[in-house]
Amino acid sequence: MQPIELSFEFFPPKTQEGVAKLRASRAELKTLSPKFVSVTFGAGGSTQQGTLDTVLEMATEGFEAAPHLSCIGSSKENLRAILSNYREHGIRHIVALRGDLPSGMGEVGELRYASELVAFIRQEHGDWFKIEVAAYPEFHPQSRSPRADLENFTRKVKAGANSAITQYFFNADSYFRFVEEAKKLGVDLPIVPGIMPITNFSQLMRFSDMCGAEVPKWIARRLESFGDNRESIRAFGVDVVTSLCRRLIDEGAPGLHFYTLNGAWASKTICERLGFKSALIAPMPSPRAARRAVFSLPL
């Protein structure tokens, strides 16, 4: 069995308090030996400098840091400058996304799709960058149909992607079905499931509505029944997501990519329940963690 790779997503903090929180969170998660960490990029490049600063700081701490890069609303000249800057700083990993057009921005930019961005990166920099792209097991909310979404995914792969990270989901069958359908179209790269820890009911429902992720009724009703009992929500959320991850690993998922929201507790608790031990706690892997992680988004 191949090692299971862990990776974690963060976003650029906007306050000094946020900076301190992120530093503490990634210090905790670093003990799980992630393969890489990714850093989001705001709509229309709104967090461009914050993304760069966060990525470079993480790189100095020994992380393989992968900045998100979205093409929507951006010119080729601007994208070329960003990529050159990352390359000059030794960054070799990119998460290539279409991104969302910010409210009030009329221009979509010179590249309209993530597949065009992937092709542009390859044209400009050859194999310098490892390129991640997004996959949608429950299909992208703006897609015409599941088939059209799958075909769009294959275009990103053929343009030169190395691997993919999915939108989060809570139905493992949707992930395995997507992987099988992608294989039928000739896709053979790793498709890593995106994992969203559950710690806040209203936040989860808001995010899921925005990105088109389905929250099963039984999960939503249980979470709703807890009301404002934060402790019960967190405990139930860890149980649900741990069970999901265990099935994904047991049935062949190549890794787990956690959407941390800049927190560490939930992601780390889930990983440890799965048998992935902190390097500071257990330098040698346990028998159960023999598949142990080199614990290493979206359209």
State where each predicted segment sits.
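Conserved, mostly hydrophobic/aromatic
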Residues: 9, 37, 86, 156, ...
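Catalytic beta/alpha-barrel core
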Residues: 36-47, 69-71, 95-97, 162-171, ...
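Active-site-adjacent beta->alpha loops and helix N-cap segments on the catalytic face
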Residues: 18-19, 45-57, 75-81, 101-121, ...
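Short, acidic/polar
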Residues: 16-29, 51, 76-83, 145-155, ...
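Catalytic domains of carbohydrate-active enzymes, especially glycoside hydrolases
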Residues: 25-40, 158
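Active-site pocket-lining/capping segments in soluble small-molecule metabolic enzymes
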Residues: 17, 113-136, 185-238, 243-244, ...
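Active-site mouth loops of central-metabolism enzymes
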Residues: 5-21, 43, 65-77, 132-148, ...
